[in-house]
Regions:
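N-terminal targeting or regulatory segments adjacent to alpha/beta-hydrolase or S9 domains
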Residues: 1-84
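Glycine-rich nucleophile elbow surrounding the catalytic serine of serine-hydrolase chemistry
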Residues: 214-226
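Alpha/beta-hydrolase-fold catalytic nucleophile elbow
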Residues: 155, 213, 238-239
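Alpha/beta-hydrolase fold nucleophile elbow
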Residues: 204-216
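Cap/lid segment of the alpha/beta-hydrolase catalytic domain
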Residues: 109-110, 114-196, 201, 246-250
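Glycine-rich active-site/cofactor-binding loop and its immediate structural neighborhood
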Residues: 74-132
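Alpha-helix C-terminal capping segments
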Residues: 227-231
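Mobile cap/lid helix-loop segments that gate and shape the active-site cleft of serine hydrolases
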Residues: 178-179, 187, 232-262
């Protein structure tokens, strides 16, 4: 072949392709905003259909239902004046243990349950002040305990590996799950919901009064659980309440790119 050109000769065409992709995405965002706004016009009519649609967007394992009530395995860590502290595991899926800290109040047998959800780089031990300081969590779990409710602080795939060990790659996990029709957000939402199923079965828990409180990424999961789980009656989302019109670039690049938004 005799025709030769400079390696930048087709840059204008490449730029056109790139810019076209960006325009397409922006147009889809505009359409999605209109669709989201329309979904609120008849709220709460059709809430079950909307909840099923949200699960379908997120993918497996939310699309397969919840099944029976899983067993809670408890290991006693401490007996404090007002509560007993356990490290617990729930088999959220076959062969997959999901762990957390469970603070059971002493005294009156039946009480509400509040989930205390840590954020990015956190652990239940950190947000619950077991490490001596709760840093930016401002004693979150301990403050929830002062309400008189039982508190459950679970671990999601977000801990700081330099501080807490056990390396992982959340983005790779999410990519592999998407190959299977799911997402890491769907998996962890399912784990949290299965934990609620398990803990609701305890004699001391009032299954009609379950709430969620989370900081940062935990706040994101708090909002998600409020949408997905009819057992969640109240939610506090700290530093994560967004309608997606606020700093969309940061949202996509730093946090919730694992989730499909529509």
């Amino acid at each position: 072949m005799r025709y030769i050109e400079n390696h930048m000769e087709a840059a204008l065409w490449r730029q056109g392709y790139r810019d076209g992709i960006e325009r397409l995405i922006e147009e889809r965002y505009k359409q999605a905003r209109v669709e989201r706004s329309a979904q609120w016009t008849d709220f709460p009519t059709g809430i079950d259909e909307k909840r099923a649609f949200a699960k379908e967007i997120l993918g497996w394992p939310l699309t397969e239902g919840r099944g029976g009530v899983p067993e809670v395995k408890k290991e006693l860590l401490a007996e404090e004046e007002n509560f007993s502290l356990y490290r617990t595991t729930v088999e959220a899926l076959p062969g997959m243990p999901f762990y957390g800290l469970l603070f059971l109040q002493k005294g009156t047998p039946v009480r509400p349950l509040i989930l205390s959800l840590h954020g990015k780089e956190g652990t239940p031990e950190l947000c619950s002040s077991l490490l001596g300081s709760s840093t930016n969590y401002n004693e979150m779990t301990q403050r929830l305990l002062k309400t008189g409710a039982h508190v459950y602080a679970p671990q999601t795939l977000l801990w700081n590996t330099d501080m807490f060990g056990v390396p992982y790659n959340r983005e790779r996990v999410d990519a592999r799950l998407k190959h299977l029709g799911g997402s890491v957000v769907a998996l962890e939402a399912h784990c949290l919901m299965r934990s609620i199923d398990a803990l609701s079965g305890l004699d001391c828990v009032d299954a009609e009064n379950i709430g969620v409180c989370g900081l940062s990424y935990g706040g994101f999961y708090s909002l998600l659980l409020a949408a997905l789980d009819p057992w969640v009656r109240s939610t506090v989302a700290c530093a994560r309440f967004t309608d997606l019109d606020f700093d969309i670039g940061r949202i996509v690049n730093e946090g919730d790119a694992q989730i499909s938004w529509k």
